Structures are given as C-alpha cells and as structure tokens.
C-alpha cells in the first residue's frame, strides 16, 4: 500500500478505470455475441446487429480499449461471416 498521497490517489484511479474498462469490454463482447446470434435470423436484423458491433469496435478502438488492428481484424471477420451467411446465390 502506498504511503504518498498522490500514489494513493493513483491506486484509486486505477481501480475505477479497471472497473470501467471491464464493463466496457463486457458490453463490447455482448454486442458481438448479439450479432452472432442474429446470423440465424433474417439478413436485415443481422445487418443492424453488424452495424452496432462495428460501431462498438470503432468506439472501443478510439478509446484505447482494444488495439486498432484488433478492432479492424474483428470487424473484418464479422463482415465476412455476414457475407458468407447471406450470400446471393446465382
């Protein structure tokens, strides 16, 4: 446990940020999971869920919650899954 006042404050700030980041990551994972579940429904619902997931990944990336390359990779994979599921035949 730190003795210096500023160090004590930094520990408290770190705790608060850890909780916030955990909540934000949980929300991000939930959004992605909802998209994956929506793939079994119609294309319109899945498209809306894909847009929400993409937006959530962009926000998380801009806030430093996930690395920009990680966000780009996940968006790419989600988009590929959507395209494969609802590909136009013929």
UniProtKB/Swiss-Prot annotation:
Gene3D superfamilies: Ribosomal protein S20. InterPro entries: Ribosomal_bS20, Ribosomal_bS20_sf. Binds directly to 16S ribosomal RNA. Signal peptide: none annotated. Belongs to the bacterial ribosomal protein bS20 family. GO terms for molecular function: small ribosomal subunit rRNA binding; structural constituent of ribosome. Keywords: Ribonucleoprotein, Ribosomal protein, RNA-binding, rRNA-binding. It comes from the Bacteria. One of its GO terms (cellular component) is cytosol. This is Small ribosomal subunit protein bS20. One of its GO terms (biological process) is translation. PANTHER family: 30S RIBOSOMAL PROTEIN S20, SMALL RIBOSOMAL SUBUNIT PROTEIN BS20C.
